Amino acid sequence: MATGVTVLPEHFQNEGVDAVVERLAAARVDMIATSPYVMEPSTDPKASREPPIDAGAGSVRLLDRPLWGKRELLVSTAPSFTPHLPFYRGLRYRPATPTALTQREGNVIPRFLRAAQSRHIQTWLQVQAAIPPGYRVQFGGPQDDDKPRLPDGSIPKRRLANNGSLASPHILDYTLALTRDLLRAYPDIDGIRFDWPEYPPYFLDDVFLDFNPHCAAAARRLGFDFPRMQQAVLALYRLLHGGLTNRHLERQLATDSGRQPLLTTLLDH
């Protein structure tokens, strides 16, 4: 069985390309994935915290491995390459603009890839499946009409993941253009790994996505009865958001095993 590890750029920016790759090789890693961005410390109050706050839950976390000598800090990022803009012509979403950080640090990505390849480690690039511009999970995101929807058609008020609808043609077109661009910029990689090609269930509402009109159109093409699905899921959503009563609890307590009554409740809602 192959062993794969994701190593984000900030770590080998700090600890050195050769040092990181040597440790991976010593651990007999078969493949690595990294992402096409670079990072630096920032003093801008609007910069991102590392580690991420993650909707407040991560605000007490500290880094296990320090970055730039700190276990928590503000950072800014930039793409590690200069995008080929003709690939994105006419698209809703655009790649991030290179900065001075790109020019100064961008070469660390191909250096890391070459160092891994020289040790017979497969190299992959990891990008976000539905968070344009896709380089890093903590920035970017979709426009409102490309966001996942609840069965009542609304956008959840509280989400951690900023993923767009996986059926959005705008996001699909951008992802195709980004894929072409990455293969142009890094032609020697073994593959591309699309991170978060799902709706991560951090909150209860996340379980009830996606009823975006883009998904309705996809369901029709695939022969699914989307209105029936939407009505059934909406009924369950309402049951779990204010519709539960003592009667449901009594059914739970009526048997030694709570699983079967719960399943019956969910199926008979």
Model segments located where?
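Conserved, mostly hydrophobic/aromatic
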Residues: 32, 116, 175, 182, ...
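Aromatic- and acidic-residue-enriched segments that line the glycan-binding/catalytic groove
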Residues: 42-78, 131-158, 195-267
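N-terminal structural segment of carbohydrate-active enzymes
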Residues: 1-57
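Surface-exposed amphipathic alpha-helices with a cationic face
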Residues: 24-25, 109-124
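Catalytic domains of carbohydrate-active enzymes, especially glycoside hydrolases
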Residues: 18-42, 63-80, 185-191
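Active-site-adjacent "subsite" loops/lids of carbohydrate-active enzymes
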Residues: 3-10, 15, 77-106, 111, ...
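Structural preference for beta-strand elements that scaffold enzyme active sites
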Residues: 2-6, 31-33, 120-126, 190-193
